[in-house]
Amino acid sequence: MSILPGIDSTPTTNELFEGTNEIHKLEIEKGYEWKVEVNAESKLVIEVKSGIAEIFGTELANDIEYSFYNNKFSILAVEDVSLEWRCPEIPEQKLMIGENKTAKYVYNLHFSLEKMRAASFDGPKVMIVGGSNTGKTALARTLCSYAIKYKSYQPMFINLNPEEGIFSVAGCLTATPISDILDVQSTIWGHSMTSGATMLHSKQPLVKTFGLEHIKENQDLYLATLKQLSEVVKLRLQNDVLVHRSGCIIDTPPISVMDDDLTELTTTFKEFNVNVVILLSDEQEDPLLTKLNDKLSTISSSFNLLRLPILSGVIERDDVFKRSLQRLAIREYFYGSPSVVLSPYTIGVDFEDITVWRPINFIENPEETSQLLPTQLLPVEVKPTTLQHALVAISYADRKANESNVQLAPTLGFGLITEVNDKRRKLRILLPVPGRLPDKAMILTAYRYLE
């Protein structure tokens, strides 16, 4: 019998979606972990019913729903855990659950750092080194979480990877005192100071704008930006006894993006007075360990160099996923997250009311920039081809300041240029708070965002 017009017994896509969004129960044995991958179009909801589970060192509260979007992480069972979850796109038969064989090394490292904090008012300065997908950032996040878990420490987390947006958008180097628990649902660890109400205590990062995506595009500028950040960190440590005693956790870029001499690491080691270096590698006699020891020993003899195995909970992240995180960081900066909704503000300004500079990219324009100083900023002509949909950093430097003052100035915030109208000589700029555009100089970053 044929189906009558307008009547179809086949369920729609929405019906199938709703039908599979059922609650699943899961038991995770102590010492095991669930590796979770959630794509951008999915939503995973988890509720721990009993036991102790943690994500990157932060414990999940029982009987509270946690929602995750576009994320990759592992849930570690500190005790036997019983939880409920729902997500139509994750097949129940294909859950990735396995034993965590590296948690004991992380615990031992944490307790060693605790002893250093207890023994001296000059806290440990830890530099974490490794390749891509070794768990560097996960280890840094876990150590920060453990440091504040039982004592009132406030470690300074320092992100030196411009491709990662942590408490900020990508393209920046940041230093953030961690004084409260980190948001396990957020890919950027939580919110910086915002105009909206947040579930958790917001953080106040110290931000320096590099402006480019890759270190190799202008290594000299990267090193100069790193040194400027280190000066700000030193000043904060001098004026804050608690942060000074808590120390610093430094997440470095992957080894693959550095030069053969490891200049980025040796500069970090020197500028931040590092005394603990952690190499994440599964090779017991990794030649990089010897190379690091030789390079760093020429700078200081008083440091500890340790090798830890690559973390068990690591989930590989490809370039497509990293791009999606960069876009998400920009979106969350202006619009917030599903749990913390923000209302950005669009203003109109004349071409003459803004001054924009840009960093030199030696990879894109080698012939144009061969005679210029690497740390020099170049003026940007206001036109659609250069500024449409561009993310700009608003500096503390006055709009009419010279380029050297702009380059040295800290970052006030970010704006998104949504429209450039040549005929009317007007721009529309999205800002995170209402009010007039600050009369400050801007730095054009390498990132674009199209709504």
Swiss-Prot record:
GO CC annotation: mRNA cleavage factor complex
Binding site for ATP: 33, 72, 133-138
Main location as per UniProt: nucleus
Disulfide feature: none
Keyword match Cytoplasm: no
Pfam family, any one: CLP1_N
Record keywords: ATP-binding, mRNA processing, Nucleotide-binding, Nucleus
Entry's Gene Ontology BP terms: mRNA 3'-end processing; tRNA splicing, via endonucleolytic cleavage and ligation
GO molecular function: ATP binding; polynucleotide 5'-hydroxyl-kinase activity
Domain of life assignment: Eukaryota
TM region(s), chain numbering: none
Cell compartments where the protein resides: Nucleus
Entries under InterPro entries matching the protein: Clp1, Clp1/Grc3, Clp1_C, Clp1_C_sf, Clp1_N, Clp1_N_sf, CLP1_P, P-loop_NTPase
UniProt KW ATP-binding keyword: yes
Assembly, per entry: Component of a pre-mRNA cleavage factor complex. Interacts directly with PCF11.
Function: Required for endonucleolytic cleavage during polyadenylation-dependent pre-mRNA 3'-end formation.
PANTHER family: CLEAVAGE/POLYADENYLATION FACTOR IA SUBUNIT CLP1P, POLYRIBONUCLEOTIDE 5'-HYDROXYL-KINASE CLP1
HAMAP family membership: Clp1
Family: Belongs to the Clp1 family. Clp1 subfamily.
Name of the protein in its database record: mRNA cleavage and polyadenylation factor CLP1
Protein species of origin: Vanderwaltozyma polyspora (strain ATCC 22028 / DSM 70294 / BCRC 21397 / CBS 2163 / NBRC 10782 / NRRL Y-8283 / UCD 57-17)
Gene: CLP1
